């Protein structure tokens, strides 16, 4: 008899399965591939494969009760035999209970992750090109624009809470096929985004001197930063609108349109920056202010492309303005109830990061320049990773909204570990080409060595950090917006902030040690987040279909969750 995989032959006292033993396929859950194929394997070999391959859809109860006979005699003796049989049966049960094979899930993830990652990578690449162009003007310009980017990131923290709430509701309503819920959720999200954009536009345009004085004490950097920030503030409304539209399109799995818009935006940004920074084609050389004008034009182009393509492709929901802003007080209350932990998290973490950046911004000029370049490289990693995080949000939220909670959990942990693996690959890829990248961005001497040290530290901790990030996004998409948010806020202000300020202000520690302490909480949070993931308590649907099945799911796993009743 031919041995099976892992040295196990399919010899036993039980009969091999026949076609009558196959479990019927359920529409929407079981793939059709392999149903019509005639296998070349013998019946015994097929039975062995039941415990090994998720593509063989036999009754998992038969698989779990099957007792294999091992090729090697030592494995057939007790207690080794009992242990291996138990492990084999558990493995067979696990495989047969898995509704979606990893290959199928991977294809679904890639369909969302690759366009989103490409869009984000293009955007980050555009920022790198900006940095390279500004690097030809000097380290002062690079550092000043980098500090302005931190103010933009604070705006990102301010509106990302509403983005997270919008993705939660839209993805779950998408799984439920609730068109009215999708439109109203998008309208609520867009209204709050507009309010945040208005506040930051005012601060950037009317109070740029105050903003720059918060971030740095260097007068040279303040002068360049004020000029840049006063202009780039007008890009914020278009930037936020593009993000809102892209969020809706991603949540309904129409990811190619934002990708095309991102490509046009990057090309526009790079072209305009080259012309306006250096004064080409008869235009005056505007320096850092030219980069700000390029950002404005790029974001306008992004919005126009998304609107035109959505209209041409007859994309639902995006342009149905009347349906966006109807009466929906109950939904607004529920939206805010689910979103406020995310909003609180993003605002407080944004403030915490600003406090960290203030510490990092009051270092030597070489360290400030190194930090600006590092943030650009970090953006590459986050852009690459965020595509997979977006896939987790959409694919898990969709199944929770449809009431398929077992499938949601199965997708969640697979995608989370995939996110971590891709993050590690991305970090190693950037680290392998660090020399030409750092030299191209105008770093040399101390600033070069500092930036390299920062990225080496980040390579070690980045995989853990992105694991925490992807788990938090997954919990939010499933309706649990509080756990990860509370955990992150607590560790930021109870551990990270004291550690950084004590090291910097009291002990005057080296810059790289202070930087490393920015991530001191990540390993501890990872352990806590993993425990919460396997508890399954984070599945809290907002859709009617999801709520209809959550009771049986919780009863099955003995889960007790206190939730406020929807109004």
Language model regions located:
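Short runs within selected transmembrane alpha-helices of multi-pass transporters and secretion channels
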Residues: 163, 167, 232-251, 258-269, ...
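Small-residue-rich hydrophobic transmembrane alpha-helices
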Residues: 142-202, 239-253, 257-258, 357, ...
